[in-house]
Amino acid sequence: MEKMIKKMNAKKMIVLVGLMMGMILAFTACQAKPAEPQTVKVGTLAGPTGMGMAEMIVNGVDLGENVTTEFTVAGAPDQLTASVISGEFQLAALPSNLGAVLFNKTEGQVVLGSVNTLGVLYIVADETAGVTSIADLKGKTIVASGQGSTPEYVLNYLLEKNGLTPGVDVTINYVAEHSEAVTQLAAGQATIAMLPEPFVTTITTKKPNIKIAVDMSEAWEAASNGSQLQMTTLVVNKEWAEANPEVLKKFMEAYEASIDSVNENPAEGAKNIVAAGIMTDATLAEKAIPNCNIVFIPVKEAQQSLNEYYTILAGFEPKAVGGKVPGEEFYVLGK
């Protein structure tokens, strides 16, 4: 009897050990497999649009195991759009209105990730011109670039909100490039201009008699009941975002930290901006950073002001937002 009991106990032990081994093997099999290697491709633009990404470009970013990041700095938006549409680029910093255009063009496959700069437009004027507000432009002539695009729509909106008719109450001489407006101011051929950064810093440094007369972001908020002028955004490939939520989360956290770093330490930020190929002059970059309104605004917080901005642009030219104001699906990453 005693031998029989021992045999039974031995069998039980064997069964128990077998069960434990089976559980260990099953547990091991259920562990997450290592992430498939992937390269996250990110596009941005030279100038203010790309400034907030400079630290990430120079120092790199950790997006997790087997994930590498490849940044491209382009001189113009049209150098990035085809790659964003095709899905080759998973993320891209672009003018806000172009984000809307791409959302409509891809039938919702390009969506909002964040807002990364507010307005970078300013009215600059000779200190003798007597301009300190939009209303002061009545009867004046200004030089500007960006005809047929966002700068023109922003200027016209603010003139009209201040009771001025473009081309009637204010003469606007459009030139092809921002640099042409700077040249005219420097030569004394013009005394008032609308310019974006860093061209504002370029002319005010070169000609101390030229001052910032109107911050167009502040004028926009005053004219639109507090709505922000959100001029550039980070857009994201929707399919990729849904398949890689943790990678996207890490990117956004790193992006916000990079933006904070540039704003908190402009001198170091300027070095990174030059090293990243976003600007060529560190001194100019450092002076321009405070006026570039570099921000990180998550989708949920950006939606109301951005929707109002798109609505205003569409009122001037529907093509500016791709034919129609983006619907709720554009803001899906904020849900």
Segments (PLM) and residue ranges:
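Short, low-complexity disordered leader/linker segments with a strong preference
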Residues: 1-39
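Solvent-exposed, polar/charged alpha-helical surfaces in well-ordered, non-transmembrane soluble domains
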Residues: 51-59, 78, 82, 86, ...
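Conserved C-terminal helix/tail region of periplasmic/extracytoplasmic solute-binding proteins
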Residues: 307-335
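Secondary-structure end/capping motifs
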Residues: 241-316
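A bilobed periplasmic-binding-protein/Venus flytrap-type ligand-binding module shared by bacterial periplasmic
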Residues: 55-57, 121-131, 229-246, 298
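Short, glycine-/small- and polar/acidic-enriched structural segments
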Residues: 35-165, 172-174, 191-197, 213
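Short, solvent-exposed loop/beta-turn-alpha elements that line the ligand-binding surface or hinge
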Residues: 61-66, 218-227, 294-303
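Pocket-lining segment of extracytoplasmic ligand-binding domains
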Residues: 97-98, 179-272
